[in-house]
Every structure is written in structure tokens, then in C-alpha cells.
From Swiss-Prot:
It comes from Bos taurus. This is Palmdelphin. The modification Phosphothreonine is found at T271. It is found in: Cytoplasm; Cell projection, Dendrite; Cell projection, Dendritic spine. GO terms for biological process: regulation of cell shape.
Amino acid sequence: MEEAELVKERLQAITDKRKIQEEISQKRLKIEEEKLKHQHLKKKALREKWLLDGISSGKEQEEMKKQNQQDQHQIQVLEQSILRLEKEIQDLEKAELQISTNEEAILKKLKSVERTTEDIIRSVKVEKEETSGESVEDIYANIPDLPKSYIPSRLRKERNEGIEDDEQNRKALYAMEIKVEKDLKTGESTVLSSIPLPSDDFKGTGIKVYDDGQKSVYAVSSNHSAAYNGTDGLAPVEVEELLRQASERNSKSPTEYHEPVYANPFCRPTTPQREKVTPGPNFQERVKIKANGLGNDVNGSIHNIDNGLAEERGNNVNHISPARPIPHPRSMIQQAEEMPHIQQERLMTPWEEPNVMQDKYTPSPKSGLSPSRALVEKSERQSSSPPCQEDEKDIRYNIVHSLPSDLDEKEPVTMIFMGYQQAEDNEEEKKLLTGYDGIIHAELVVIDDEEEGEGEAEKPAYHPIAPHSQVFQPAKPTPLPRKRAEVNPHENTNHKSPHKNSISLKEQEESLGSPIHHSPLDVQIAGDGTEDPSLTALRMRMAKLGKKVI
């Protein structure tokens, strides 16, 4: 009650203080108005006094004096009113100060008497405990027409609390046996296995280590006996972790995944695999599929690959020209080097065959093949050339230089694929091209060292970007231009037809006075057993200038 009275007194003090502040503000406004009137009358009195000095008649002078006296009287009244209002304002300010002081005192008393929220909650609890002595049954007894068998929900809950706590009356909906291995050093628990059990057959054997009303955990030793020694209760976090591990173990799929398998070689990923992959038993079939993907008939190609593996491994000069580069792992490089030899034979154009025939008839220490072997391969090429001519418009290939002989087979192989744009056979374009009469003019410039002599072997230097393209550099280069015989792209494979302005390589060497004279068959094989660079450069030039070579 004291707190309520203090609150009322405080509110009254605040109200009085507010009224006094309003009166003070009104009186100050009135003082401002009185001061304005006072200034106006003073100015008027001075003006009349100044006019009075210039008037000579007596009547006017008397009237001016009376008016001046009235103004002086009003000025005095206004001055007194201003002084009175200022005094009243001072009194009101003092009263306001007094009220503020009383308000502060009341506020201090109120704070000392006022209860906090905790005190209020505590008092409410105490009052509730005091009034709880009244029975619930007595409350419901006052309700008319209530059946005697009715039991309130509160009473039913209180009566059933003891029954619900009984373990025997609770039925398990789901049971699971989890085998857990605990590390005594780190204290971590690992789930080894989890087996669901029928809820009807479950018997709560062992020691209860956890129970939150929804889940119960019993500890049982490995021999299905209760382990009383060293068994402690489990924390909720540990129980949740065990359940999570058990659920993850059950959700794991036994399916084993492997790398994607592509039937079409052109659908394989461009990123090379880092892991070593061993060739499977179906390698011959894969080779057959890859060869068929180029649009050529390769019956008998697998037989040639199998028979030539021992001879061609490490020494064979291979050419691969797929539609795009296909990466291979290191373990597949040897097989990949052997496969494209047949593909290059299928992709050889008719006007390129005469140059290749010279190389096939001559035994080469690099290829390791006998002349009879070369003849067999040539006959196989001739038998397979018609389907190549049929699909010549659709097949696109590139010329790739041979691998160096001293390259380690275990190292990765980098291949360069050079593409050329197809030139359409238009009469207008032929007119624009100066000197074009339907014949390809292939010119080869060979830098040779004639002063050093023939005994010094040529050393191959490799291009920094393409290690498979060889450029032969002698120790001291002396440029001597040589021109290769002109070749018609439509030349037949069985015979050569000479053209005008075509000079053979032998005639060029004789005209230039070269000390070295070779037959057309010997020129193409160097002294060290490697392929003559003129043949390789001529192939590149012909592929670059040909109409149907892309």
C-alpha cells in the first residue's frame, strides 16, 4: 500500500510541476508583449516632445503636453507590470524547484519500496503454494450434473506417473544390437556392426547406461553377460554419435564404382589419366573399333599387329591421325605406338604412294623389316586402297613425324596434329594464283656441309614444342638450294608421268656439282639409317598445297 501511495504522490508532483511550467511560459510571453508596448510608448513620447518645441500656439502646445503626460503614465504602468510578472515568474520557478525536490524524494522512497520482477514472481509462487491446499476434487465438486465416475485430467496424470515409470509396462517399438569398440587411450567409440532385432524378442539384459524416456541403452559384454566392471553412463552426445555411425554404416552401398568406360574412342575425356592402366583382354577388339572409326575396312589388321609386335616395338616408325588427339596413360603407350601403323597405310593418298614405295623396297635398319616383309605390307596396302579412295572426301588426316630412335618408351609421348584448310576447286581462284597450272611445285632447301666430308654423321635436333618432328642440323651449315621434282596430285600409283619444267633430284645434284651422288632409291635413306628429311619435307609440302589434303 505504501508503494501505491508513493506512486500517487509522484504522479501528483509531476502534474503540479507541469502546470507551473505552463504558467511560467505564459507569463514570459506576456512580459515580451509589455516590453514591446513600453518601447513603442517611449518612442512616441520622444517624438511628441520634439514636436512640442516647434509649436508656437498655446492650445496646441497644451494638447501636446496632455498627450505626453498620458504616455508617460502608460509607460510607468507597463514598467510596473513587467516588474510584477518577472517577480511572479521567479516565484513559480521556486515552486517548480520545490516540487522537483519533493519528486526526487518520492522517487527514492519508491525505489526502496518497489519490488523487482524476481520479487513479484517469488511472491506469486508463494501465494500459489498457499492456495494449493485446496483439493482439485473440491473444485470439481461444485460443478453441477458432473458424473461421479469423471476423473479430471490432472488427477489421471498424477495417478499414472508411477505406472509410466515402470520398465515392465513399457513396450519397445524398435530394437537394435550395436557392436561398439572403444579405444581406452583416446576414449573414441567405433561402431563395428549393427543388427536390428525384433521388438518382441528384445529383453533388456545388461546394465542401463542411458535413458531419456524415448531411448534406452543397455551395456552387454561380448559373451552376452552384464558387464558391471568399468561400466559408466553414456552422455546424450555419445548416444547420438553411436546412432549416427550405425545409421551411416547401414546406409553405405556395397556397390563398387570404377572409371567410366567409353565404347567410342572419340567420346573419351581429354584429360590424361594419372593412374597406370593395364590393357585388358579385349585390347584387340578396342583396336579394331578404333580403326573402324576412321571409315576404313581393316580386315586382317589385328593379325598384322600381333605378328609385328616383337619386330616393331621401339623401332617402328608410326603415324597416328585421328580426328582429335586422344590422351593415353603411360602403360598404354607401347600398344598405341603399334596400332597406328596400319591406319597410316590406309590413309595414304594415291599421289603419295610412289614416294612411299621407294622407302618400302629399300631395307632400313631403323624399321627392322626385310624386303619381303615390305612387299607383303605393300600388297596389303594396295588391296586396301580402294575403300580409302571411296572415303577420301570424308577422311581428314594430318602428317606426324616419326618418333626419335633414342626416345625412351616409358616416357610420355607428345604428338602434334597439324590441320590444313581445304581449298575448293574454283576456276576464279586458279586465275588469282600466279603460276598455278594444276601441278604442285614442291621445293626443298637442304643445308649441307660439303667441307667436313661424308664421314661426319648428321645429328638430329628436336623442336622445343614438338619432340617428334626432327630437323637435321649439320655442324657448319652452308646453304645449297636443291629443287625436288614436281609431282602431280592426280598422279597414278602404278606409273609416273613426267611434266614440263620437272627436274629430277639426280639432275639437280649433277648441275650443282655436288660431290655426293645417290640414286633416287638411295637418296631417301640417310647413312645413319634414319629417313631422308627430303621425303618428310616433301610430304609436308604436298599436304599443305594439295587440294584434298586437310
